[in-house]
């Protein structure tokens, strides 16, 4: 019988795991190696070992309605995309609201997690920690690892011939904090993920010249999408997700390409992804095309050679003088406190069932939360994982035999997506809505839209055609939240009200009213045929 649960890390997934354990009568003990909660979202001027690091200007890429905990919306006065300082404040509010701090031991490093001698029977773990030089050991019935994957920088210097001769400065993007370091310098940023693009844009305001080197390109979108709404509230809907999964791949690729190029022509700007047949994680940046068109950022192909004070790019013999190189080349994940046999990692891929449970263990009492890259927000993903894990630990949900789980893991590895950047953890990518629904189905928490269409059609239509906000995940099942329905039906109000800081008189026309009525009727007909 699982009772005591050790949780490693007090970031967004660790906090959710504590709350899920408490709600189901388990006894969580969370070990956080730093002095406070927040993980990635707690900015510090200096990089801390073993903790994710962010730069001072970081703003969330997911909007507040899409990236909140499923039963705890962001405060209404928060902007739609949240700066890191406010994001940390939100996490502190969450921890206070649900009394989570009492379960956290700060400044406590987990040294090792090993199986107890009777693990085959008990499934228990021995957890060794150290706090202020004092080592302790304790036994737990289960472990939830919530350390993320943004702590071990991937810096493949062997891939850049001549880097040892470079006399300028170079560092991984993990070390970046402020743009002052680029003042009056010639800067090269390697890697066109979110961090690399952000850093290149920031550098372009102070540097003499900025180059952004990319191997595979990327779709670049703004946080501000159709009609000024947040991109993910328009893009991440169950209806669109259904179309993306049902339509032929060439059709989906064409539609995505057309949509992505509606802001600017990616080919003309030199950033178009080489492989446009798959839906891949877009790069979120509101400024990049403006910096490119004004000559402040120059897009370049991969590096051919690094020299003492310059760089030669592929497909061009010209040497470009460079003072600073920033390697935004991603991260690798590791669990230094676990034996390699517990979480098996091969070719950058972890053998985790549903990205969570080590598939080979005879007892499913160790889970990894947040080791996934969904095309969606991390908070509701990690929270849903934690809810599912707790139900497994309680015995309310059962897992398949290890052989079946290993088969699914191996199939996933074969069908892995391709990602952005030089080192993107490909095996961690997942379709957000499909993945969440799969976990919710296992714990009987997925909303039944067919039944809801008869009992609450307004809510059903909002869920199917509207943004897939986390509140969907609390309408039913264990952890049901009574405020979920209201949160869904008022989500657009909260989105718009925060930007309406000046009242403008609207004058709707009769034509617009009739058009809306006709559209609504057409929508009802479409829904009727979809759910037949």
UniProtKB/Swiss-Prot annotation:
Cofactor dependency: FAD
Keywords of the record: Endoplasmic reticulum, FAD, Flavoprotein, Membrane, Monooxygenase, NADP, Oxidoreductase, Transmembrane, Transmembrane helix
GO CC terms: endoplasmic reticulum membrane
EC number of this enzyme: 1.14.13.148, 1.14.13.8
Segments on the Lumenal face: 1-510
Compartments where located: Endoplasmic reticulum membrane
Protein name, entry field: Flavin-containing monooxygenase 1
Gene source species: Rattus norvegicus (Rat)
């Amino acid at each position: 019988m699982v009772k005591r649960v050790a949780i490693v890390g007090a970031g967004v997934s660790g906090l959710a795991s504590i709350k899920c354990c408490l709600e189901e009568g388990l006894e969580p003990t969370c070990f956080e190696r730093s002095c406070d909660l927040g993980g990635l979202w707690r900015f510090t001027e200096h990089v801390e070992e073993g903790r994710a690091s962010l730069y001072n200007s970081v703003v969330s890429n997911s909007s507040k309605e899409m990236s909140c905990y499923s039963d705890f919306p962001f405060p209404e006065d928060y902007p739609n995309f949240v700066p890191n300082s406010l994001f940390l404040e939100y996490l502190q509010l969450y921890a206070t609201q649900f009394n989570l701090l009492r379960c956290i031991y700060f400044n406590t490093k987990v040294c090792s997690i090993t199986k107890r001698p009777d693990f085959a029977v008990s499934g228990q773990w021995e957890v060794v920690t150290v706090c202020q030089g004092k080592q302790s050991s304790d036994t737990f019935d289960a472990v939830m690892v919530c350390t993320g994957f943004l702590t071990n920088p991937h810096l493949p210097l062997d891939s850049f011939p001549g880097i040892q001769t470079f006399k300028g400065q170079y560092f991984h993007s993990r070390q970046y904090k402020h743009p002052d370091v680029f003042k009056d310098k010639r800067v090269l940023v390697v890697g066109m993920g979110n961090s690399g693009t952000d850093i290149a844009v920031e550098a372009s305001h102070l540097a003499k010249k900025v180059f952004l080197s990319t191997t595979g390109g990327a779709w670049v979108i703004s946080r501000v999408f159709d009609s000024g709404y947040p991109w993910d509230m328009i893009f991440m809907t169950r209806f669109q997700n259904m179309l993306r999964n049902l339509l032929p791949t060439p059709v989906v690729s064409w539609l995505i390409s057309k949509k992505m190029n509606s802001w600017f022509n990616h080919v003309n700007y030199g950033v178009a992804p080489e492989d446009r047949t798959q839906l891949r994680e877009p790069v979120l940046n509101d400024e990049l095309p403006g910096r490119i068109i004004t000559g402040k950022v120059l897009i370049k192909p991969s590096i051919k050679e690094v020299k003492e004070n310059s760089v030669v790019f592929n497909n061009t013999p010209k040497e470009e003088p460079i003072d600073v190189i920033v390697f935004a080349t991603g991260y690798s994940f590791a669990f230094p406190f676990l034996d390699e046999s517990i979480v098996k990692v091969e070719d950058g891929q972890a053998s985790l069932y549903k990205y969570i449970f080590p598939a080979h263990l005879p007892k499913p009492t160790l889970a990894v939360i947040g080791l996934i890259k969904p095309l969606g927000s991390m908070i509701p993903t990690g929270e849903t994982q934690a809810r599912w894990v707790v139900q497994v630990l309680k015995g309310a949900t059962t897992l398949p035999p290890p052989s079946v789980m290993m088969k699914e893991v191996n199939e996933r590895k074969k069908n892995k997506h391709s990602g952005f950047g030089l080192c993107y953890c490909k095996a961690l990518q997942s379709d957000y809505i499909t993945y969440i629904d799969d976990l919710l189905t296992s714990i009987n928490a997925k909303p039944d839209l067919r039944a809801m269409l008869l009992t609450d059609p307004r809510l059903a239509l909002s869920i199917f055609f509207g943004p897939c906000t986390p509140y969907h995940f609390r309408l039913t099942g264990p952890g049901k939240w009574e405020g979920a329905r209201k949160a869904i039906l008022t989500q657009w109000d909260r989105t718009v009200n925060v930007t309406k800081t000046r009242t403008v008189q609207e004058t709707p026309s009769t034509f617009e009213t009739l058009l809306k009525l006709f559209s609504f009727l057409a929508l009802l007909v479409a829904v009727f045929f979809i759910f037949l």
